[in-house]
Protein backbone atom coordinates (compact mmCIF):
# COMPACT_ATOMS: atom_id res chain seq x y z
CA UNK A 1 0.00 0.00 0.00
CA UNK A 2 1.20 3.46 -0.88
CA UNK A 3 -0.20 6.16 1.36
CA UNK A 4 0.36 9.05 -1.00
CA UNK A 5 -2.58 11.35 -0.40
CA UNK A 6 -0.31 14.40 -0.68
CA UNK A 7 2.06 12.97 -3.30
CA UNK A 8 1.35 12.79 -7.02
CA UNK A 9 3.08 10.10 -9.08
CA UNK A 10 4.22 11.69 -12.36
CA UNK A 11 5.70 8.66 -14.08
CA UNK A 12 7.20 5.22 -13.57
CA UNK A 13 10.20 3.86 -15.51
CA UNK A 14 11.91 0.50 -15.86
CA UNK A 15 15.16 0.35 -17.84
CA UNK A 16 14.56 4.02 -18.73
CA UNK A 17 11.27 3.10 -20.45
CA UNK A 18 7.95 4.59 -19.33
CA UNK A 19 5.50 2.13 -17.80
CA UNK A 20 1.76 2.58 -17.56
CA UNK A 21 0.30 2.70 -14.06
CA UNK A 22 -2.76 3.59 -12.03
CA UNK A 23 -2.64 5.44 -8.73
CA UNK A 24 -5.89 5.10 -6.82
CA UNK A 25 -6.11 5.99 -3.13
CA UNK A 26 -3.11 4.34 -1.49
CA UNK A 27 -2.33 1.83 -4.25
CA UNK A 28 0.12 2.28 -7.12
CA UNK A 29 -0.39 -0.49 -9.68
CA UNK A 30 2.34 -0.76 -12.31
CA UNK A 31 1.79 -2.64 -15.58
CA UNK A 32 4.85 -4.68 -16.58
CA UNK A 33 5.11 -5.82 -20.17
CA UNK A 34 6.24 -8.50 -20.41
CA UNK A 35 5.14 -9.72 -16.99
CA UNK A 36 7.79 -10.48 -14.39
CA UNK A 37 8.31 -14.00 -13.10
CA UNK A 38 7.61 -14.41 -9.38
CA UNK A 39 10.85 -14.00 -7.40
CA UNK A 40 12.59 -11.92 -10.08
CA UNK A 41 14.61 -8.99 -8.76
CA UNK A 42 14.16 -5.86 -10.83
CA UNK A 43 14.18 -2.11 -10.43
CA UNK A 44 11.75 0.71 -11.17
CA UNK A 45 12.02 4.46 -10.74
CA UNK A 46 8.95 6.27 -9.41
CA UNK A 47 8.88 10.02 -10.08
CA UNK A 48 6.62 12.04 -7.82
CA UNK A 49 6.00 15.47 -6.33
CA UNK A 50 3.83 17.08 -3.73
CA UNK A 51 3.62 18.43 -0.20
CA UNK A 52 4.22 15.61 2.28
CA UNK A 53 2.09 15.31 5.38
CA UNK A 54 3.52 14.47 8.80
CA UNK A 55 2.27 11.65 11.02
CA UNK A 56 3.62 9.51 13.84
CA UNK A 57 6.72 11.02 15.46
CA UNK A 58 6.99 13.67 12.73
CA UNK A 59 7.56 11.74 9.52
CA UNK A 60 8.33 14.89 7.50
CA UNK A 61 9.35 18.11 9.23
CA UNK A 62 9.97 21.51 7.60
CA UNK A 63 11.20 23.79 10.40
CA UNK A 64 14.08 26.05 11.50
CA UNK A 65 16.91 25.79 14.02
CA UNK A 66 18.56 29.02 15.18
CA UNK A 67 16.73 30.77 12.33
CA UNK A 68 18.10 28.42 9.63
CA UNK A 69 15.77 26.19 7.58
CA UNK A 70 15.93 22.44 8.21
CA UNK A 71 13.97 19.62 6.59
CA UNK A 72 14.18 16.12 8.04
CA UNK A 73 12.34 12.82 8.20
CA UNK A 74 11.64 10.37 11.02
CA UNK A 75 9.44 7.65 9.60
CA UNK A 76 9.13 5.15 12.46
CA UNK A 77 6.97 3.17 12.50
CA UNK A 78 4.58 3.93 9.61
CA UNK A 79 5.42 7.45 8.40
CA UNK A 80 7.62 6.64 5.41
CA UNK A 81 4.74 6.69 2.94
CA UNK A 82 4.01 10.28 3.98
CA UNK A 83 7.01 11.49 1.98
CA UNK A 84 7.98 8.77 -0.52
CA UNK A 85 6.01 6.15 -2.46
CA UNK A 86 6.79 2.90 -0.67
CA UNK A 87 5.26 -0.25 0.75
CA UNK A 88 5.01 0.79 4.39
CA UNK A 89 5.02 -2.60 6.09
CA UNK A 90 7.53 -3.27 8.86
CA UNK A 91 8.65 -6.68 7.58
CA UNK A 92 9.05 -5.69 3.92
CA UNK A 93 12.49 -4.49 2.80
CA UNK A 94 13.84 -2.97 -0.39
CA UNK A 95 17.10 -4.65 -1.35
CA UNK A 96 18.70 -1.27 -2.12
CA UNK A 97 17.86 2.41 -2.60
CA UNK A 98 19.15 5.46 -4.44
CA UNK A 99 18.10 8.80 -2.96
CA UNK A 100 18.35 12.00 -5.00
CA UNK A 101 17.70 15.21 -3.08
CA UNK A 102 17.42 18.56 -4.89
CA UNK A 103 18.04 21.38 -2.41
CA UNK A 104 19.37 24.95 -2.19
CA UNK A 105 23.14 24.98 -2.75
CA UNK A 106 23.72 26.81 0.54
CA UNK A 107 22.83 23.59 2.41
CA UNK A 108 24.01 19.98 2.64
CA UNK A 109 21.81 16.88 2.37
CA UNK A 110 22.42 13.71 4.40
CA UNK A 111 20.78 10.33 3.89
CA UNK A 112 21.29 6.57 4.11
CA UNK A 113 24.28 4.91 2.52
CA UNK A 114 27.31 6.35 0.80
CA UNK A 115 27.43 9.80 -0.77
CA UNK A 116 27.81 9.36 -4.53
CA UNK A 117 27.72 12.91 -5.83
CA UNK A 118 26.81 16.53 -5.21
CA UNK A 119 26.08 18.29 -8.50
CA UNK A 120 25.65 22.05 -8.32
CA UNK A 121 23.28 23.57 -10.87
CA UNK A 122 23.13 27.28 -10.15
CA UNK A 123 21.31 27.92 -6.90
CA UNK A 124 20.39 24.24 -6.46
CA UNK A 125 22.38 21.08 -5.77
CA UNK A 126 21.38 17.49 -6.50
CA UNK A 127 22.81 15.15 -3.87
CA UNK A 128 22.84 11.39 -4.58
CA UNK A 129 23.09 8.79 -1.81
CA UNK A 130 23.33 5.03 -2.49
CA UNK A 131 22.43 2.33 0.06
CA UNK A 132 23.06 -1.28 -1.00
CA UNK A 133 21.73 -3.37 1.88
CA UNK A 134 18.16 -4.54 2.58
CA UNK A 135 16.28 -1.76 4.38
CA UNK A 136 12.75 -1.35 5.73
CA UNK A 137 10.95 1.73 4.40
CA UNK A 138 10.68 3.33 7.86
CA UNK A 139 14.50 3.42 8.15
CA UNK A 140 14.98 5.47 4.98
CA UNK A 141 15.66 9.07 5.99
CA UNK A 142 17.16 12.36 4.89
CA UNK A 143 17.88 15.78 6.33
CA UNK A 144 18.85 19.10 4.74
CA UNK A 145 20.28 22.15 6.53
CA UNK A 146 23.48 24.16 6.93
CA UNK A 147 25.55 21.17 7.99
CA UNK A 148 29.30 21.25 8.52
CA UNK A 149 30.71 17.97 7.20
CA UNK A 150 33.66 16.28 8.90
CA UNK A 151 35.44 13.60 6.85
CA UNK A 152 37.31 10.94 8.82
CA UNK A 153 38.04 7.25 8.55
CA UNK A 154 37.76 4.24 10.83
CA UNK A 155 39.89 1.09 10.75
CA UNK A 156 37.73 -2.04 10.76
CA UNK A 157 40.18 -4.91 10.89
CA UNK A 158 42.48 -4.20 7.97
CA UNK A 159 39.94 -2.06 6.09
CA UNK A 160 40.04 1.72 6.29
CA UNK A 161 36.40 2.88 6.07
CA UNK A 162 35.46 6.48 5.29
CA UNK A 163 33.20 8.13 7.86
CA UNK A 164 31.32 11.38 7.30
CA UNK A 165 29.73 13.28 10.18
CA UNK A 166 27.10 15.95 9.49
CA UNK A 167 26.88 18.54 12.30
CA UNK A 168 24.93 21.73 12.88
Give the residues covered by each predicted segment.
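Hydrophobic residues in beta-strands and at strand termini
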Residues: 2-4, 31-32, 48, 103, ...
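Hydrophobic helix-coil surface modules that form long, contiguous segments used
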Residues: 75-76, 87-168
Amino acid sequence: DLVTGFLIVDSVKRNNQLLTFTHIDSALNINFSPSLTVGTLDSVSVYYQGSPSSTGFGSFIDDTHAGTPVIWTLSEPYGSADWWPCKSQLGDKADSIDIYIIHPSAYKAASNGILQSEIVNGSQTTTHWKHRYPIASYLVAFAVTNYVVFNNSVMLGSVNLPMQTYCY
